[in-house]
Amino acid sequence: MQQRRPVRRALLSVSDKAGIVEFAQALSARGVELLSTGGTARLLAEKGLPVTEVSDYTGFPEMMDGRVKTLHPKVHGGILGRRGQDDAIMEEHQIQPIDMVVVNLYPFAQTVAREGCSLEDAVENIDIGGPTMVRSAAKNHKDVAIVVKSSDYDAIIKEMDDNEGSLTLATRFDLAIKAFEHTAAYDSMIANYFGSMVPAYHGESKEAAGRFPRTLNLNFIKKLDMRYGENSHQQAAFYIEENVKEASVATATQVQGKALSYNNIADTDAALECVKEFAEPACVIVKHANPCGVAIGNSILDAYDRAYKTDPTSAFGGIIAFNRELDAETAQAIISRQFVEVIIAPSASEEALKITAAKQNVRVLTCGQWGERVPGLDFKRVNGGLLVQDRDLGMVGAEELRVVTKRQPSEQELRDALFCWKVAKFVKSNAIVYAKNNMTIGIGAGQMSRVYSAKIAGIKAADEGLEVKGSSMASDAFFPFRDGIDAAAAAGVTCVIQPGGSIRDDEVIAAADEHGIAMLFTDMRHFRH
């Protein structure tokens, strides 16, 4: 049963005025009476639209610098009144039914994001009347349509045209869901902000409490339902943040291939975030959330060829990420050489997509070009709780490194050390990465002891016939014993980059000196669990 409700009267009060004039014109052209407030009313009047100010309708002026505009029984009675049940009392108090409410809220998020925003500024951008109208209309969705997103304007007009000026219950219910999501997200932002301001508010500190309020409210929007999760007996969906500011797997568009799986998305994220570390043309190949080959080159084809050489066996069925447009030559090389689950790049040429289309199962994603990395939060779910931390955006340059051994690294060793240090950040701990000439030649990931990660990296290099002598090695955390250095030296490593900080640093440095290895301390750790 459609349960259509005609739209005869609409109340419009928006902070974000994108598209509101055109929407109001369309409503007016269909005989809808327009009520409005403040700046929205002035804008519509300036455009020649017949509009009644809410203060004229209620007979009560706006007051307290606009804090009180719509908090009136004639407004909320018109929204909440149940058609066919409350008609008599509405008529007794001269309350006209309001069939549609078009509201978006004061820009609280934009206000508090501004540098130097005071608590007073934030408070004045907490909307009261707006959320009240939104919730009233959503509660009475059986009779009233609530519109909080400008992206819905065109579809609403089309449905009205298809239904003789009416909207169906299904549409009103869908709009009500969006409305409650909108107010929930809005209240969450305010609660998070106030929660982080508690010490400053009570005079305990001049600074806010930081990024972590005492109650953490999160809002994510479902982007995809998945066939299943990490395993086939687990149900799953993919949720994303609204207004993501950095190109990511969350913002990516799938331009080709079958549906993404849970594991595809997780691995694609790992590959893309790693390739973002490099300014030069780069390729990252990931398998089970770990890089199995990384390289930079003169072109992305060169980078791919070199990354693939690290571990062709593991590259089978992997995820490939680039930091440049996917071109036809590179696409052909991939398709001719290996089975690949996902290719992600900032963009893809038409010629490249024609080539990858020959393999229907290959998923191709484009995410747009990225700029600077955006600070944010990382989450890890534990049973009954949530671990929250800042994203690991830590970086070191050559000028920040400390040479702690007798021998200084050569220029090439230094370049390779910085290269494999970037890669190690994205390898599961304990992480060891061997690199030579700006390509990985062996990766040891996820071992419970660091020395075994070092041994595995050497074994991988030997298995592929890659020359380790003269290579650099990165370790995501300090060496607790000298055995990792001994293993690296036995494989042929001549330079080591690591955080330092072990109580046995002296022994580790002495081991490096014994082997003639140059050692660099970053004073920064990159655990990844």
Curated annotation (Swiss-Prot):
The modification N6-acetyllysine is found at residue 287. It comes from the Bacteria. InterPro entries: AICAR_Tfase_dup_dom_sf (IPR024051), Cytidine_deaminase-like (IPR016193), MGS-like_dom (IPR011607), MGS-like_dom_sf (IPR036914), PurH-like (IPR002695). The keyword Acetylation applies. Residues 1-148 form the MGS-like domain. Keywords: Acetylation, Hydrolase, Multifunctional enzyme, Purine biosynthesis, Transferase. The keyword Glycosyltransferase does not apply. Its EC number is 2.1.2.3, 3.5.4.10. Pfam families: AICARFT_IMPCHas (PF01808), MGS (PF02142). Pathway: Purine metabolism; IMP biosynthesis via de novo pathway; 5-formamido-1-(5-phospho-D-ribosyl)imidazole-4-carboxamide from 5-amino-1-(5-phospho-D-ribosyl)imidazole-4-carboxamide (10-formyl THF route): step 1/1; Purine metabolism; IMP biosynthesis via de novo pathway; IMP from 5-formamido-1-(5-phospho-D-ribosyl)imidazole-4-carboxamide: step 1/1. GO terms for cellular component: cytosol. GO terms for molecular function: IMP cyclohydrolase activity; phosphoribosylaminoimidazolecarboxamide formyltransferase activity. GO terms for biological process: 'de novo' IMP biosynthetic process. It catalyses: (6R)-10-formyltetrahydrofolate + 5-amino-1-(5-phospho-beta-D-ribosyl)imidazole-4-carboxamide = 5-formamido-1-(5-phospho-D-ribosyl)imidazole-4-carboxamide + (6S)-5,6,7,8-tetrahydrofolate; IMP + H2O = 5-formamido-1-(5-phospho-D-ribosyl)imidazole-4-carboxamide. PANTHER family: BIFUNCTIONAL PURINE BIOSYNTHESIS PROTEIN ATIC (PTHR11692:SF0), BIFUNCTIONAL PURINE BIOSYNTHESIS PROTEIN PURH (PTHR11692). NCBIfam families: PRK00881.1, purH. Belongs to the PurH family. The IMP cyclohydrolase activity resides in the N-terminal region. This is Bifunctional purine biosynthesis protein PurH. It comes from Escherichia coli (strain K12).
